[in-house]
Amino acid sequence: MKLFLAAIVLCATAATAFPSELAQRAAGDLSKRQSITTSQTGTNNGYYYSFWTNGGGEVTYTNGDNGEYSVTWVDCGDFTSGKGWNPANAQTVTYSGEFNPSGNAYLAVYGWTTDPLVEYYILESYGTYNPSSGLTSLGQVTSDGGTYDIYSTQRVNQPSIEGTSTFNQYWSVRTEKRVGGTVTTANHFAAWKALGLEMGTYNYMIVSTEGYESSGSSTITVS
């Protein structure tokens, strides 16, 4: 009986001794997974993250543990989201997860360079619309167990990391979709350069989920 009473006293003491610590832990866990619905950038668990939306529909972005993020969208306008690095380099990217679009959406290693200003996509998967439709392939690059068609187009007076600008957009589009694997970005950058597609100083690079006038969900972990 004395042992039983002692155990009760110890449990009661523990329950009263640590409420603030438990609250701090709960608050910390909540902040790590706080949902975001307006455009912002920042750092989370050692990774750069970027979330941009034009405000259309319902889009909710959530930073998870380490390199994980998730995003859900319903009848969205246009958004881009993801985790990665800033500044980036010609690095090898590994990612895994789930990508479940209904309509037009992209899963890509996505980023920018400056001087010159360039927006680029290494497209791993997409929804109902292939963004290379209507474009002429400039060539191909074989990398990481797959073949990618290369495209270039110009964007005129469009949003960019330098405000509304005119800039080149480069694409490597994987011929067989996948969700998960390794992307050796240096192979794509070298192939683009060989075709005369010049890049500048690396800005940010993320594994991006992007949606346009669609619905869906995506949970991705980068490393």
Swiss-Prot record:
<feature type="region of interest" description="Interaction with protein inhibitor XIP-I">
    <location>
        <begin position="5"/>
        <end position="7"/>
    </location>
</feature>
<feature type="region of interest" description="Interaction with protein inhibitor XIP-I">
    <location>
        <begin position="85"/>
        <end position="87"/>
    </location>
</feature>
<dbReference type="Pfam" id="PF00457">
    <property type="entry name" value="Glyco_hydro_11"/>
</dbReference>
<dbReference type="InterPro" id="IPR018208">
    <property type="entry name" value="GH11_AS_1"/>
</dbReference>
<feature type="active site" description="Proton donor">
    <location>
        <position position="210"/>
    </location>
</feature>
<dbReference type="GO" id="GO:0005576">
    <property type="term" value="C:extracellular region"/>
</dbReference>
<feature type="site" description="Interaction with protein inhibitor XIP-I">
    <location>
        <position position="44"/>
    </location>
</feature>
<keyword id="KW-0732">Signal</keyword>
<feature type="region of interest" description="Interaction with protein inhibitor XIP-I">
    <location>
        <begin position="123"/>
        <end position="130"/>
    </location>
</feature>
<keyword id="KW-0378">Hydrolase</keyword>
<dbReference type="InterPro" id="IPR033123">
    <property type="entry name" value="GH11_dom"/>
</dbReference>
<feature type="site" description="Interaction with protein inhibitor XIP-I">
    <location>
        <position position="176"/>
    </location>
</feature>
<dbReference type="InterPro" id="IPR013319">
    <property type="entry name" value="GH11/12"/>
</dbReference>
<feature type="region of interest" description="Interaction with protein inhibitor XIP-I">
    <location>
        <begin position="18"/>
        <end position="23"/>
    </location>
</feature>
<keyword id="KW-0119">Carbohydrate metabolism</keyword>
<dbReference type="GO" id="GO:0031176">
    <property type="term" value="F:endo-1,4-beta-xylanase activity"/>
</dbReference>
<dbReference type="InterPro" id="IPR013320">
    <property type="entry name" value="ConA-like_dom_sf"/>
</dbReference>
<feature type="active site" description="Nucleophile">
    <location>
        <position position="119"/>
    </location>
</feature>
<comment type="function">
    <text>Endo-1,4-beta-xylanase involved in the hydrolysis of xylan, a major structural heterogeneous polysaccharide found in plant biomass representing the second most abundant polysaccharide in the biosphere, after cellulose.</text>
</comment>
<dbReference type="InterPro" id="IPR001137">
    <property type="entry name" value="Glyco_hydro_11"/>
</dbReference>
<comment type="pathway">
    <text>Glycan degradation; xylan degradation.</text>
</comment>
<keyword id="KW-0858">Xylan degradation</keyword>
<comment type="subunit">
    <text>Interacts directly with the wheat xylanase inhibiting protein I (XIP-I).</text>
</comment>
<feature type="signal peptide">
    <location>
        <begin position="1"/>
        <end position="17"/>
    </location>
</feature>
<feature type="site" description="Interaction with protein inhibitor XIP-I">
    <location>
        <position position="170"/>
    </location>
</feature>
<keyword id="KW-0326">Glycosidase</keyword>
<comment type="similarity">
    <text>Belongs to the glycosyl hydrolase 11 (cellulase G) family.</text>
</comment>
<dbReference type="GO" id="GO:0045493">
    <property type="term" value="P:xylan catabolic process"/>
</dbReference>
<keyword id="KW-0964">Secreted</keyword>
<keyword id="KW-0624">Polysaccharide degradation</keyword>
<protein>
    <recommendedName>
        <fullName>Endo-1,4-beta-xylanase C</fullName>
        <ecNumber>3.2.1.8</ecNumber>
    </recommendedName>
</protein>
<feature type="domain" description="GH11">
    <location>
        <begin position="35"/>
        <end position="223"/>
    </location>
</feature>
